[in-house]
């Protein structure tokens, strides 16, 4: 099995659990609460090496994983639906898919709200006004509300790279210089 196949299988597994939880929560009208809880869970996962170890290490058995996510859910005040889904992931030895589970849930929630996320990499930090104008422009093109994930990469020299769904717009000076360099190689 290749790494790509393994990642695809993990995403597929996570997608099934995420879809089931999303359907359950959507029917009860708790999408906004779920969105907030998923953000909290993702932050906890990113901040805690112990939590990442718990989800990835084969040294923990089902009962230990289930007890740990149960305690975590209670401490974080997660909804019964999310807590039970996390316990089920642990019971079925699927906690390793937690990052894909969170990503899939975020996508489902964004689709339900008519939102799309744009990843923006710029050479300098964008001002709030620039972010608002960019979000408005992208919203006009996509017909959906746009949330920006902005980060800075000084190696771009200037400009930015915007990824919206499957589209990418690269207006960075670094890419323009690379194109110019390639064009000069063809001439000379």
UniProtKB/Swiss-Prot annotation:
It is found in: Cell inner membrane. It comes from the Bacteria. InterPro entries: ATP_synth_OSCP/delta_N_sf, ATPase_OSCP/d_CS, ATPase_OSCP/dsu. The keyword Cell membrane applies. Disulfide bonds: none annotated. Belongs to the ATPase delta chain family. This is ATP synthase subunit delta. It comes from Paracoccus denitrificans (strain Pd 1222). The gene is atpH.
């Amino acid at each position: 099995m290749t790494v790509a196949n393994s990642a695809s299988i993990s995403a597929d597994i996570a997608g099934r659990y995420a879809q089931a939880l999303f359907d359950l929560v959507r029917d009860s009208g708790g999408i906004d609460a779920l969105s907030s809880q998923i953000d909290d869970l993702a932050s906890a996962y990113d901040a805690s090496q112990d939590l990442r170890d718990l989800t990835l290490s084969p040294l923990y058995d089902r009962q230990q994983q289930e007890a740990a996510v149960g305690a975590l859910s209670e401490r974080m005040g997660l909804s019964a639906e999310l807590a039970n889904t996390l316990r089920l992931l642990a019971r079925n030895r699927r906690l390793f898919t937690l990052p894909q589970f969170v990503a899939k849930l975020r996508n489902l929630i964004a689709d339900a709200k008519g939102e799309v996320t744009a990843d923006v990499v710029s050479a300098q930090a964008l001002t709030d006004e620039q972010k608002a104008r960019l979000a408005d422009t992208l919203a006009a093109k996509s017909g959906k509300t746009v949330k920006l994930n902005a980060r800075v990469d000084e190696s771009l020299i200037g400009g930015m790279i915007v990824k919206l769904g499957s589209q990418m717009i690269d207006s960075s000076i670094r890419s323009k210089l690379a194109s110019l360099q390639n064009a000069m190689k063809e001439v000379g």
